[in-house]
A protein has these predicted regions:
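N-terminal beta-propeller domains
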Residues: 1-93, 147-192
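A short beta-strand motif characteristic of beta-propeller blades
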Residues: 48-55, 93-102, 137-142
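A broadly used, surface-exposed interaction patch
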Residues: 86-113
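A short local loop/turn or secondary-structure capping micro-motif enriched for an aromatic residue
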Residues: 94, 103, 129, 168-169
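Hydrophobic or amphipathic alpha-helical targeting/insertion segments
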Residues: 107-151
Length: 192
């Protein structure tokens, strides 16, 4: 592919759009230091490159990154039936699913959230899953009391939204939360 140098004016997205003498949008490029002090040069984006030639058993349906207590990056991925971690030295997806696997339907996907040293995942069809990123061996059930389509954290709580439990079945407008700083405690209490 040939590279063509085209003289463009300066990149001035902070000026008003009307009668702006410079560029207000620049696609497929990244900014870098220019040849003179205070100037910016736009460089083309690097092309995509193969990072790993391994794959999951089916289409990826979610991924997450995290960090263990030693500062090592952790990469997790999910498909319909398995949860994986990416081994940094070999760049190979390793199956670390619970025994029995998972049953993610075609309309669902995996959603992840980091809580302390835990990486927590949910797909609504199976129990929420957790893995301690410091140990990093195998995912296990976070709880069997509630399932959720959406997951997040807020001030020491793990929240599940669009829930399913044995008391009320599927309730798309309900949010359930764990105990304070206890992501594995999902005991229902009328007081909360």
């Amino acid at each position: 592919m040939a590279v063509i140098d085209a003289p463009f004016t300066s990149f001035t997205p902070d000026l008003p759009r009307l009668n702006n003498p410079g560029l207000v949008k620049a696609h497929n490029c990244s900014a870098g230091l220019g040849p003179a002090p205070g100037t910016v040069t736009l460089f083309p984006l690097k092309s995509a490159a193969l990072y790993s030639n391994t794959s999951m058993v089916s289409r990826p349906l979610g991924s997450a990154i995290g960090m263990d207590r030693d500062g090592n990056a952790k990469v997790y991925g999910a498909c319909a039936t398995k949860l994986y971690k990416l081994a940094p030295s070999t760049r190979v997806w390793t199956d670390i699913s619970r025994a029995g696997g998972y049953a993610t339907t075609a309309t669902q996907r995996w959603r992840f959230v980091e809580f302390g040293s835990l990486q927590i995942a949910t797909n609504f069809n199976d129990e929420p899953q957790q893995i301690n990123m410091n140990v990093d061996l195998q995912f296990a059930n976070l709880t069997t009391l509630v399932k959720g389509r959406y997951i997040n954290t807020f001030k020491g709580f793990v929240l599940l939204g669009y829930t399913q439990d044995s008391l009320d079945g599927i309730v798309n407008y309900r949010i359930r939360w764990s105990g304070l700083e206890l992501p594995g405690d999902w005991t229902f209490s009328p007081a909360t």
